[in-house]
Amino acid sequence: MAPPAPADLGRVLAPDTVRFERLLPGPVERVWSYLVESDRRGLWLASGTLEPRVGGTVELTFHNARLSPEPVPERYRARSGPIASRQRVTRFEPPHALAFTWGSAAAPSEVLFELRPDGDRVRLTLTHIRLDRQARLDVSGGWHTHLAVLAAHLDGRDPPPFWSLLTTIEAAYGKTDQDRSDTCSAS
């Protein structure tokens, strides 16, 4: 697999913040449905219920092994799923903004998805905040890979081989982290 273009890499906005931007086929309401509907979200990230209100619960169940037919490499067995977490909605503005906590209840980070029309496409901006350095490194390759799977579904294409792409992306982020201070690496 070819390494990603530098423009596609997540950008570190602050030591605790990474941002990704993608242009996706629209309309906005269609992309929104892939954020809030369990079956559609499960195609690219994690299934589970989402209470559509600030303070509502988000149940996320990751089944990464189901995102493509590729066998799970040994090094990723622990990430293959199912992995369940319970989070809290922190922003809900259909169909333009969704945010929820991420990670442990003791020290959660937060993920914000923003959608806006951009010509005949939709600009998705994903911002992950309140990350310590290791967490930022850990989530960057995952977000990049999951967003590639989302883009494929929205484009009507088969998703890329999840584990091969994740391996390539993590290597690219690792090299970029050494070469440039405005992007982040993945573990």
What does each of the following model-derived ranges do?
Residues R22, G48, A84-R91, E110-P117:
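Hydrophobic/aromatic beta-strand elements that line small-molecule binding cavities or substrate pockets
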Residues G81-V89, E93, I169, Y173, ...:
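Alpha-helix-centered segments that form part of catalytic cores
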Residues T17, A99-A152:
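Beta-strand/loop substructures that line and gate deep hydrophobic ligand-binding cavities in soluble
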Residues A2-P3, I129-C184:
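A conserved amphipathic terminal alpha-helix motif
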Residues M1-R53, T57, S185-S187:
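Hydrophobic ligand-binding cavity/cleft-lining segments
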Residues V28-E29, E51-V54, T90-P95, L115-R123, ...:
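A short, structured loop/turn motif at beta-sheet edges
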Residues R53-T57, S80-S85, E93-P95, P108-E110:
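Short connector loops at helix/strand junctions that flank enzyme active sites
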Residues S38-P82, F162-E170:
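Short beta-edge strand/loop motif at the mouth of beta-sheet-based domains
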